């Protein structure tokens, strides 16, 4: 049995030495297809060297301490990508001002999916400005523009099922 918490402790310790944040540690698959996927980040972006250092050190420690017993596994270390998952309070604080896509556990005003600009995060609640992007089913208006109605939604972090950044290209 793999002790995922023990693995996470090792990954956190190694990442901290390089000034990196651990976004996610997960095991996937079974048998010969087992994969340990580690996602790391830092404000100025993750480099290939960052991934290489973490991969080499974590691999050595896991092998020496025999934390992952049995068959072989593949170790993958990567950055979170442009559409990274955000879940911790620190993530929402860091990415205030960014475009986000959020799914809630229960419907709010008849919807579970919201996309817009993360306006703020305070007291465990995020505020999303829905005017930042056209919403599903919303059509572009032709002719004279109607007055813009501010559309915002406030969601408690505990109600967030999934949240990701939306790349702005």
Swiss-Prot record:
It comes from the Bacteria. HAMAP family: RimP (MF_01077). Belongs to the RimP family. Required for maturation of 30S ribosomal subunits. It is found in: Cytoplasm. SUPFAM superfamilies: YhbC-like, C-terminal domain, YhbC-like, N-terminal domain. Transmembrane segments: none annotated. InterPro entries: Ribosome_maturation_RimP, RimP_C, RimP_C_sf, RimP_N, RimP_N_sf. GO terms for cellular component: cytosol. One of its GO terms (biological process) is translation. Keywords: Cytoplasm, Ribosome biogenesis. It comes from Koribacter versatilis (strain Ellin345). This is Ribosome maturation factor RimP. The keyword Acetylation does not apply.
């Amino acid at each position: 049995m793999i002790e995922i918490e023990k693995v996470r402790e090792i990954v956190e310790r190694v990442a901290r030495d390089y000034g990196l944040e651990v976004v996610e540690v997960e095991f996937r698959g079974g048998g010969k297809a087992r994969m340990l996927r580690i996602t790391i980040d830092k404000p100025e972006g993750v480099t290939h060297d960052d991934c290489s250092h973490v991969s080499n050190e974590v691999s050595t420690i896991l092998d020496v301490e025999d934390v992952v017993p049995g068959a072989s596994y593949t170790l993958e270390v990567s950055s979170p990508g442009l559409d990274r998952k955000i879940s911790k309070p620190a993530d929402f604080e860091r990415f205030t001002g960014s475009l986000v896509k959020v799914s809630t556990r229960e419907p709010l005003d008849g919807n579970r999916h919201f996309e817009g600009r993360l306006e703020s995060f305070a007291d465990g609640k995020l505020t999303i400005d829905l005017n930042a992007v056209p919403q599903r089913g919303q059509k572009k208006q032709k002719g004279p523009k109607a007055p813009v109605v501010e559309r915002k939604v406030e969601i408690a972090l505990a109600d967030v099922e999934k949240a990701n950044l939306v790349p702005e290209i």
